[in-house]
Amino acid sequence: MVHFSLAIPATLTEHSLNFVANFSNQPRPLIVKVHDSFLLETKAKAALTRITTQVEGMEFVDGVPANNVSDWARHWSTVYDWRKVEDELNSKFRHFTTTVQAGDNYTYPVPLHFIHHRSPRHDAIPLLFLHGWPGTFHEVGNIVDLLTNPPNTSLPAFHVVAPDLPGFGFSPAPTHAGLGLREMGQSFNSLMMQLNYSRYVGQGGDIGSHILRLMAADFPVSLVSMLSNLFSVSPNATDLERYAKHETSPDETAQISLLKNPDFSWTKAYWDIEASAPLQVSIGLTDSPVGWMAWQYMGMRMLSPGYDWGVDELITWSMLNYIQGPYGGIRSYKEAKREGVLDGNFPYVAQPVGVVQYFGDAAYYTPLEWTQRQGNISFYSRKAPHVVGGHFPAYINPRALAEDCWAFWGNESRSGSGIFLREALLAPAWFPQGSNVRDQ
């Protein structure tokens, strides 16, 4: 029998996370507070950003244009106010920390930061929201009120739990190898059990969706159903053979062509370098806040067509993964590669699965028939190209994704959500129904 210790290792407490936090073995409230010294250092580094000389006419082909980087550096060092953002994060979200187990294959404690917003509705469904790269808990901010307090009682409501993946945001990066996506999923199931949610549903895209698919196999009773906004399915040998013979359907042709498009090589380049040499690439990105901002922005821009990212907005997204350093989040790709996830090796999801696709994301044209090979697909929706959302629909187009959630889980036979009406789930003892933990 494996014995777990939930004591935080000395290596974590000795290493500066650059923010104030206490990770115990039970959920505790957190007030986000980044160290003054780190903020001063970051502004100084932004001011000292060295701008790369670029080749004319290759803007957004070779990378982010130099003038963008120069403008960001100036704005970050002279205008951007993290303390204002911090106040907004503390007033908008109910933050918690805890420590959980991650199963037999990773016996070290897993400290987590998470958001927990309970609905006032007695019939609300517990929902585990998992972000992707390069996101954080922040992705849930624009949709959480729609989920906890839908506009009318005919729509399903949710108790929303949105953790930072380990190494992202305020969830400390693992200090040992072996915390892959499957182990992350086991830690998130432990979190839901700790919150007294014995059954729950899941929503996620990108890495978050990958984790939910692994969780579905590991926890077939607890995870009742899932809604994915990036249900990745690779074409098999037969698909590629038919494509070469021009025998594929329009959807199949579009998705395979997308994967073969030279522009898509940008996305694959991120996977390859982050999965192969995460520490090497992180050395420079950890030292340069603006360099890190440019690194993540190139992918964000390509995967969210039609959305205009503001400078303050981009800096905040960058800061949330720069505070503790980007290495832990980047290294998750190395673990995903080890598990075969980057090659599309997933277990079949027997639970009901909803699939929604937003234009610009990597799996936009994936045919229904392909998704049915890897899951019990009971809901499938592809948005028209003019509908914004891309890789980040919860953040960019929260109403549209909320409507997907309502449509999927509002249908009991399609999603299995009827079980939540038949079971009386008790509110967690440490977080009474309707209470505001910040007042305790």
Task: Label every model-predicted segment.
Residues M1-A10, Q440:
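Fungal secretory targeting signals
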Residues K84, T153, V161, L165-L179, ...:
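Glycine-rich "HGGG/HGxG" loop immediately N-terminal to the catalytic nucleophile
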Residues A124-G132:
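Short beta-strand element of the alpha/beta-hydrolase
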Residues L146-L155, Q194-Q255, R414:
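Conserved hydrolase catalytic core segment
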Residues H176-Q194:
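Alpha/beta-hydrolase active-site loop
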Residues E274-Q440:
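C-terminal subdomain of alpha/beta-hydrolase-fold enzymes, centered on the catalytic histidine
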